[in-house]
Curated annotation (Swiss-Prot):
The gene is rplU. GO terms for cellular component: cytoplasm; ribonucleoprotein complex; ribosome. It comes from the Bacteria. It comes from Polynucleobacter necessarius subsp. necessarius (strain STIR1). This is Large ribosomal subunit protein bL21. Belongs to the bacterial ribosomal protein bL21 family.
Length: 103
């Protein structure tokens, strides 16, 4: 069984037992969270689509860790004008383990 969930402005296809890095959620490590924005639920040949969400569907997950992604370097330059600008960014993430999918 799999589900398509929406969290942090992004959509993820998840199945039970998967580990997933999502946008940061303020939750303690080891705590159980419920992701209730489920867009679709599928099982082998059948697919249940929401309009926009599937009624009564939820995904239960456990927070495994909190962290930061690798640094992304931004470099801006204007040719012949002696303008150069360096900037870096590190995005926070939450790693979760999908426990169950309730449809």
């Amino acid at each position: 069984m799999y589900a398509v969930i929406k969290t942090g402005g992004k959509q993820y296809k998840v199945a039970a037992g998967e580990k997933l890095k999502i946008e940061q959620i303020p939750a303690e490590i080891g705590s159980e969270i419920t992701l209730d924005q489920v867009l679709a639920v599928g099982e082998s040949a059948s697919l249940k689509l929401g309009d926009p969400l599937v009624n009564g569907a939820a995904v239960m997950a456990t927070v495994v860790s909190q962290g930061r992604h690798d640094k992304v370097t931004i470099f801006k330059m204007r040719r012949r004008k002696h303008y150069q600008k360096h900037q870096g960014h590190r995005q926070n993430f939450t790693e979760i383990l999908i426990n169950t999918i309730k449809a």
